[in-house]
């Protein structure tokens, strides 16, 4: 690795003599005391030998050489075969005091990759300017993202015909589970838009296939052993199943609207079910196109947009209720709780467990020891917002089936599972814990991780490769999933506790789970944007610029 050292005196540069003499014994007596090298556009870390501990970055855009244009031979070590006069040597020594000297740990070309690693480290550690957002394909991707999100919101404002919307909205405020689903749809259910089903049928289809993968070994092999091709097949099956779920939920919603329909006929039912199904398919398609942009998960971003659009109305109702009742203390408690909730979510979302790794063939260029920066990161909440989305959709399923079938037992179950019901909180916590544990091991299979580490020549200290490593990773993930489940359970139970303290229920539709979705999607998108910018910086760097050294 090429380092940059600051020389404090003329004699300090004599330490280069021993290392360079091994390369060329014949020219060792002709070495200059302080040689200036040709520098390509590298970003390399520096360290001072005396009284300097802070690292700093050097951006070298000029070709520096101790001689004039006569030096046309590739000479990266500064070994000049010509003798120089004493006056020239004194002058170059004076220049070396004013500029840093470049020292290479070895003179062969095998050190070039370590120089490239210096560039990579400098790129990853460098700050991102605001102007970087307007370079490369990133602006075009953001425009496409905004266009897709605007198109998904447009379907919310195209209503179904023949429905008394005012009467339906009045009944919607009294139904907690529909209010929660209305949050995920961005007010689409209340507005009776053709895209009011949103992404919920696709999420239900995902839940069903993930559960079926544990029952049918063929699906599990298709998901894990066949790689990307198998996952594409499961995604295709999920799309087909989402259409079926959309038809079922559309029929249930249409029959639920029967008391509010002016002319409830067969033609109206068929047309409404068709429009709602097509709206759900369109939303699912938009979500997949958003995922293809690699700026975040399409499903999460659609729900993120819906919650953001629902936030002003929800907060306005809460404020109006507090002002009407004179409950200023309760309003302040909600605001403080919201801020603390956001801080806690950000803290937990960024927390991770780092497991150190040892590589059999990865050494540092100077010390010759194992690289210390290699580790395996496991996030505390690695499942993200998906367990909450799955849990909410599962709790809404009995109410949908009850509206469709009219069975009294399902109505009782749906009533018990609504927010504020007797079984809502414990069932929600159990479902969140189950989906969090399941989704954690679905994303990170300990056997697969152990096999990949073994192929890469990596091992965990004091743990044998193979089954012992898989068991160790499984234990770590199990403990982390417990912490993540406890965190998600606090989010699920927190709003209910705040409601009991403040006696304000209008804020129920915007719960802690919604805040987690907002923060999770925002941090994930910010991370993807940062990765995109770093990728563009890598594309603009040439690690091997040997052409300009040719005579």
From Swiss-Prot:
The chain crosses the membrane at residues 142-162, 192-212, 241-261, 268-288, 295-315, 328-348, 382-402, 415-435, 482-502, 503-523. It comes from the Eukaryota. Its main location: plastid. Cannot substitute for SCY2. Belongs to the SecY/SEC61-alpha family. Part of the Sec protein translocation apparatus. Interacts with SECE1, ALB3 and probably with SECA1. This is Preprotein translocase subunit SCY1, chloroplastic. It comes from Arabidopsis thaliana. The gene is SCY1.
């Amino acid at each position: 690795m090429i380092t940059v050292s600051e020389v404090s005196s003329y004699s300090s540069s004599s330490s280069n003599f021993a290392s360079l003499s091994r390369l060329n014994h014949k020219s060792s007596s002709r070495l200059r005391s302080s040689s200036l090298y040709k520098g390509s556009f590298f970003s390399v870390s520096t360290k001072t030998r005396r009284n300097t501990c802070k690292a700093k970055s050097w951006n070298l855009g000029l070709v520096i050489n101790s001689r004039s244009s006569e030096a046309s031979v590739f000479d990266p070590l500064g070994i000049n075969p010509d003798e120089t006069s004493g006056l020239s040597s004194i002058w170059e020594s004076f220049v070396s005091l004013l500029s840093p000297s470049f020292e290479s740990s070895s003179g062969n070309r095998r050190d070039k990759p370590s120089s490239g690693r210096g560039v990579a480290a400098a790129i990853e550690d460098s700050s991102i300017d605001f102007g970087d957002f307007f370079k490369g394909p990133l602006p075009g991707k953001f425009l496409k993202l905004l266009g897709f999100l605007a198109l998904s919101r447009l379907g919310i404002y195209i209503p179904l015909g023949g429905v008394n919307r005012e009467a339906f909205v009045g009944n919607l405020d009294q139904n907690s589970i529909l209010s929660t689903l209305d949050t995920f749809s961005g007010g689409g259910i209340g507005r009776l838009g053709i895209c009011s089903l949103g992404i919920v049928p696709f999420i239900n289809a995902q839940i069903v296939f993930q559960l079926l993968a544990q029952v049918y070994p063929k699906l599990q092999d298709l998901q894990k052993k066949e790689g990307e091709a198998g996952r594409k097949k499961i995604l295709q099956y999920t799309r087909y199943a989402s259409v079926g779920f959309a038809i079922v939920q559309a029929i249930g919603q249409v029959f639920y609207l029967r008391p509010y329909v002016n002319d409830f006929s067969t033609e109206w039912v068929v047309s409404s079910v068709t429009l709602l199904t097509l709206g759900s398919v369109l939303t699912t398609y938009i979500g997949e196109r958003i995922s293809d942009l690699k700026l975040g998960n399409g499903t999460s971003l659609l729900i993120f947009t819906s919650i953001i659009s629902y936030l002003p109305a929800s907060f306005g109702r809460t404020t109006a209720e507090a002002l009407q009742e004179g409950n200023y203390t309760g309003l302040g408690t909600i605001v403080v709780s919201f801020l603390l909730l956001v801080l806690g979510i950000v803290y937990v979302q960024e927390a991770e467990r780092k497991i150190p790794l040892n590589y059999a063939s990865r050494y540092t260029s100077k010390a010759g020891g194992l690289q210390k920066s290699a580790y395996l990161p496991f996030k505390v909440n690695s499942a993200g917002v998906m367990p909450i989305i799955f849990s909410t959709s599962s709790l809404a399923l009995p109410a949908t089936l009850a509206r469709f079938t009219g069975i009294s037992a399902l109505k009782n179950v749906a009533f018990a599972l609504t927010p504020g019901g007797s079984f809502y909180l414990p069932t929600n916590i159990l479902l969140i814990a189950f989906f969090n544990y399941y989704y954690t091991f679905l994303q990170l299979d300990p056997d697969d991780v152990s096999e990949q580490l073994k192929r890469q020549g990596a091992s965990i200290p004091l743990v044998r490769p193979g089954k012992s490593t898989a068991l160790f990773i499984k234990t770590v993930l199990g403990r982390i999933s417990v912490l993540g489940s406890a965190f998600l359970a606090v989010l699920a139970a927190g709003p209910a506790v705040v409601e009991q303290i403040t006696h304000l229920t209008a804020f129920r539709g915007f719960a802690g789970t919604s805040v987690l979705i907002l923060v999770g999607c925002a941090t994930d998108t910010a991370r993807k944007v940062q990765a995109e910018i770093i990728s563009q910086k890598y594309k603009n760097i040439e690690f091997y610029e040997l052409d300009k050294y040719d005579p």
